[in-house]
Amino acid sequence: MAQTTTTAFEATFFEFDQPAAANHPMTCFALYGKGGIGKSTTAANIALALASQGKTVMLIGCDPKADSTALLRRGKPVETVLSLLRTRHKSQLRLEEMVTRGTGGVLCVEAGGPKPGVGCAGRGIIAALEALKAQDAFNVCKPDVVIFDVLGDVVCGGFAMPIRDGWAKNIFIVTSGENMAIHAAANIAVAVGTFSERGYARLGGLILNCRDVPREREKVEELAGDLHTRIVCELPRSEEVQHADEQGVTVMEMAPEGPMAQRYRELARAVLAACETTPAAPKRAGGSSFTF
């Protein structure tokens, strides 16, 4: 990639300190993707699949809607970190105010966001993660796995915050074969590639969340080829998952022995395995049919 000058945005973004390193082995990864693609459902089911294996899992929602952990709390709202920061300084917050336990003991955190039309959601995510750092959340809670669920329609400084080294070192993009989902996935991958070159993160692969559109697998495989990555798991479209969502729970909780629960367990294993490998940095291949 050609040498570029640092933009005002990047200068602002990189002035934040790196999070303190955890004193125990820990796997951190983030799920990105177009809004409505199923990131939060996927993240919650992966979290519960890993928790059912005896792992301590922390799920951090980085979406202004603050609904990333909803399926692990049966729809019960959780106080967001940003709402707490409106009342006092980050140094005055208690960790137990920011971190709550959900189904299976999953540690749930919601960054939150500003009121619609006021403030910057990306900056809110930065503030929330800095508040967790101030309370040394990783070393106190000692999670084995940390999952960031991040809105990926716009990869600005705040929404890119989890990509930074010390937060999420492995990025997985949830996509379907729909054109807008593929377009968003391609843009996210380019952003990840930029950070990879600086040593911040790497693309672990694509998660195909099927919508049963024509040539779906073929289109996503073509995208994976363009990005020099792979599909780590395919999730078939399932009424079982939709029914669980309507009930406000994960399919891992509603039907733990069902076929979709088994598929999420396979996905959880595949993601952890991918985190242990070192794939090439994502980049655009010559002759790609996708517009980045």
Over which residues does each language-model region extend?
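Short, glycine/acidic-enriched loop or turn micro-motifs at the edges of active sites
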Residues: 64-66, 113, 152, 212
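N-terminal phosphate/diphosphate-binding loop that engages ATP/GTP or pyrophosphate donors
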Residues: 49-111
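Flexible beta-alpha connector loops of hexameric P-loop NTPases
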Residues: 113-123, 179-180
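Conserved beta-strand scaffold positions in the cores of enzyme catalytic domains, especially
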Residues: 28, 59, 106-108, 231-234
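Residue-level signature of catalytic and energy-coupling elements of molecular machines
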Residues: 35, 109, 128, 149, ...
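Extreme N-terminal, non-catalytic leader segments
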Residues: 1-37, 41-58, 93-94
